[in-house]
Amino acid sequence: MSRVAKAPIEIPAGVEVTLNGQEVTIKGAQGSLSRVVNDAVELVKDESELRTNAREGVANSTAQAGTARALLQNMVVGVTKGFERKLQLIGVGYRAQAQGKKLNLTLGFSHPVEFEIPEGITIDTPTQTEVVVKGADKQLVGQVAANIRAYRKPEPYKGKGVRYADEQVRRKEAKKK
């Protein structure tokens, strides 16, 4: 039995939740997010909370209700506070510069890498070796950060590459003669 689904989602002041069948739209200070919830989940909205209930007689509906509750909670947090993911560029000559809707990356290739910033995401570069990805959609923020990291993953011998700020890179010892 999913314990996650039993906890209600608190709707803070300034957040508007709209239910249209199985589609949930949440609006807040950081923007608006929308998601279609699985048919195995029943949504109940009170004045200041949202509940996800498992439908009776549907296989794995409790698991689906727990998943839906976690996703909706992330949407509420996203439209109120937002999410961010920090990346570091480690290596000689590795640089990042945000220009409008593009992120220019110099990662040791023979050409600069231009990364197109998707809608709903803002990218800051506090220094030339730091990239901060911000947005309301947790999944999109993580995906954009993973796409940037994929251009040059940290290598295990010197640790050069693009890494998350909280990532520990396992180092290998060089081959001995």
UniProtKB/Swiss-Prot annotation:
GO terms for molecular function: rRNA binding; structural constituent of ribosome. This is Large ribosomal subunit protein uL6. PANTHER family: 60S/50S RIBOSOMAL PROTEIN L6/L9 (PTHR11655), LARGE RIBOSOMAL SUBUNIT PROTEIN UL6M (PTHR11655:SF14). Part of the 50S ribosomal subunit. The keyword rRNA-binding applies. This protein binds to the 23S rRNA, and is important in its secondary structure. It is located near the subunit interface in the base of the L7/L12 stalk, and near the tRNA binding site of the peptidyltransferase center. GO terms for biological process: cytoplasmic translation. Gene3D superfamilies: Ribosomal protein L6, alpha-beta domain (3.90.930.12). PROSITE patterns: RIBOSOMAL_L6_1 (PS00525). One of its GO terms (cellular component) is cytosolic large ribosomal subunit. Keywords: Ribonucleoprotein, Ribosomal protein, RNA-binding, rRNA-binding. The keyword Transcription regulation does not apply. InterPro entries: Ribosomal_uL6-like, Ribosomal_uL6-like_a/b-dom_sf, Ribosomal_uL6_a/b-dom, Ribosomal_uL6_bac-type, Ribosomal_uL6_CS. The lineage of its organism: Bacteria, Pseudomonadati, Pseudomonadota, Gammaproteobacteria, Alteromonadales. Belongs to the universal ribosomal protein uL6 family. It comes from the Bacteria.
